[in-house]
């Protein structure tokens, strides 16, 4: 069974992937859905517009800086933590039920 969706590790990869899919005479999203991860502006300028998960980069930076400062100030008591940062789904034109 062929795949129904490709999830790219970043939005920029989609720009190359879309050309490869089109070279096989496949239509996006009719034959294959595509999803990215970044939310960069370029993803909304391409055709079709990419459905992507926009990262909370500002929040990631703030949390990373806070944790780094904690490790520097308290090197013996710093604890490794798992931090979760939300994102935002930007609905484009590259996903449909197949």
Q: What are the language-model segments listed below?
A:
Residues 1-98:
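Flexible loop/turn connectors
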């Amino acid at each position: 069974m062929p795949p129904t969706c490709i999830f790219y590790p970043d939005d920029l990869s989609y720009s190359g992937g879309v050309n490869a899919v089109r070279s096989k005479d496949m239509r996006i999203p009719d034959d294959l859905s595509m999803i990215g991860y970044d939310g960069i502006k370029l993803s909304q300028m391409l055709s079709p517009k990419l459905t992507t998960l926009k990262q909370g980069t500002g929040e990631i930076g703030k949390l990373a800086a806070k944790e780094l400062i904690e490790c520097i100030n308290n090197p013996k008591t710093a604890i490794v933590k798992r931090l979760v940062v939300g994102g935002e789904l930007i609905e484009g034109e590259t996903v449909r039920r197949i």
